Amino acid sequence: AYYNAILWVITGKQAHADKAMEIIRAYAGTLKKIEGPDDPLCAGLQGAMLVNAAEVMRYTYTADKYAAGWNAEDTQKAESMFRNVFQPVLTTFYKTKPYTNGNWGIAVTKAQMAFGIFMNDRKLYEDAVEFFMKGHDNGTLPNYVAESGQIQESGRDQQHAMLGLGCLSEIAEMAWTQGQDLYSALDNRLMKGYEYLAKSNLGYEVPFFTWKDITGKYSNWTTLGEEGMGRFRALFEIAYNHYVERKGLEMPYTKIVLDMIRPEGPGFTCDNPGFGSLLFYLGKDLNAGQKPGRIDEDLSRHEGWTFTGCSYKSVDNVMSFVSSGVSMQKKRISYQAGSYPYIAVKAPRIPASINKDWLQLSYSVASAPEFWKLDADKAQKVGEDIYVFKVTDALSNNGTRFTERPTNIT
């Protein structure tokens, strides 16, 4: 429902509006209860997505302009669902003795604030703000992000730390639209969390201490969690936009991450909304001076590229650095082969022993990745170091001809 609502606003295609309405009405007309051991997470994460979809449709697809548009009955049924099905789960969580990692409480607060805004319920909203700042739980700003920027779940793994921090920024963004600044709370504590998360996941050393959490159950992590390290989710743009574009502050490590992953893609399941470059970025045109669909990449600079190289292993009982070759790749490059069928690569130092298909392109076909290996021996040589490949003649590993339509490639 949420993504169809966004697509409706962007494209103006009524099919997306009708699908969003169909989904919202189906839930509002049938959902009676949310239960299970993870019900606060379900009500928090999925509830936040659903109420945001309802918020968009309520004010952009109205019954006075569209026959199937949002009407008074939709408001009544949606509010009844949020108040009588979702909200009791959130209220129970707030009243229960703390028992979870912080991302649970943050997800609950994200949904409650969104419900309060949708239903014009000031108490729900203010209670969410109170919990965000002062709640007795791991899921509050001071209890989730330390002064150093370390996150309560940094020692657990990186995906949960990203989930929690992303939800905190969504709370701050909602409050900002209501005229309240939670971003600046505790001397820009949220910004410090982002910089710590970005810096540590980029491989830089950061200070780490064993966290004493509210529950006492999660106080035995003595190092940064390795799981998920360096796998950046789509949740950095929202905070970067506020602190850098709105406030003129600096987030150097977050900028490095965004240079690698822009434009941000979808969120992970329903954890965070994703597509932050589309939804939140308010800076200068990132494509200014570029021709749509034309690749213009500087291979000598690290921005956006990931590398694999040597590893440290035993050779004849001696620990040695061993390399089977160095590879580099960059994801989500916008390319349109129909307009630019040739790719020229300036590569002055290619070893004679390297495989001739050192340039490979890939994108998904029918939800599965396919790969196009371009033969350097068949490339047109310009001078000593420029190879010109014709992409539209290439066939994939499955025999598929490279598309001429705009697509994001690796």
Predicted regions and their residues:
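Active-site/pore-lining binding-face segments in mid-to-C-terminal subdomains
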Residues: 151-231
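Extracellular structured ligand-interaction cores
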Residues: 47, 103, 109-110, 294, ...
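Transition segment at domain starts
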Residues: 310-315
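Noncatalytic modules at the cell exterior or secretory-pathway interfaces
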Residues: 396-410
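Extracellular carbohydrate-recognition regions
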Residues: 287-309
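Extracellular ligand-binding interfaces
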Residues: 317-399
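Aromatic-lined, polymer-binding surfaces characteristic
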Residues: 1-179, 187
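Terminal, non-catalytic domain-edge segments
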Residues: 178, 192, 214-291
